[in-house]
Amino acid sequence: MKQVFKIGNSEELNTTECDLLMEIGESHVCFGILDHSTKTLLQSGYFTTEEKDNGDILQNIFEQNAELRSPFHQTVVGYYMTENVLIPSKFYFFEKTKSILQAMYDGMQNIVISESIPGWQMYNTYHVPAAIHEFINRKFAGGNFWHAHSVALKNGLPQREEGNLMVNFKTDSFSVMVTKGNSLLLAQIYPYITAEDVLYFLLKICKQLSLSQTNVSLILSGLINHDSAVYKGLYQYFVNLQFALPDDGIRLSESFSEYPVHFFSSIFKLALCVL
């Protein structure tokens, strides 16, 4: 397990007045601790592992970060998992959708979860590694759990006739949600190693969905900044680049002063689901 960053002082926390916000991926875990009344992010940590789908990373994180074992006002978990399908509500049947998911992916060691997204009239069905699902259920029996795509949809996506690509970066993957007008065209997670990998996928998406590189807007969030090779590569091929703005009402404590606000967009979106 590798710690990418840990921000904030756990000694000053009163966790019973805070919300624990946690995003769990196949090779990363990040968390935020938010003061519920002031809507201020007090602490955040980001960890990675080379062993995918391994529940041990969660065990290690909880052992090494004692504050996570404290009682919280409420807990929200977002599953950042690549194996998912979005189905319009009128075509949704759980067993049929489960069969589609299992036909697309090897689901032998996975749990199938399905959740409704009423505002979009669709269901999101996805795999969660059994070891991770069991660990989280033991720790947070009364928590709120959604897929990362579901969280983004619950918060609402910007509408623009020329199209939007909302791109959120992790250390070795990025998610893309594409809208045109009020329609969702794509929600997918891609792996990457180099800036060229990111360009390849985004240019391919624009070509397949007939989106103009000149007119489409890229809204960037997560672990990316102006000086990164990824941003410089995108700047050469896309005209409209912007970093995600902070969500209304949520603030960062002084401990975060050296970090861009858009680094924590995923945590903010989890918070907005329950505030």
Predicted regions and their residues:
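Hydrophobic/aromatic-enriched cytosolic interaction surfaces used to assemble or bind macromolecules
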Residues: M1-L275
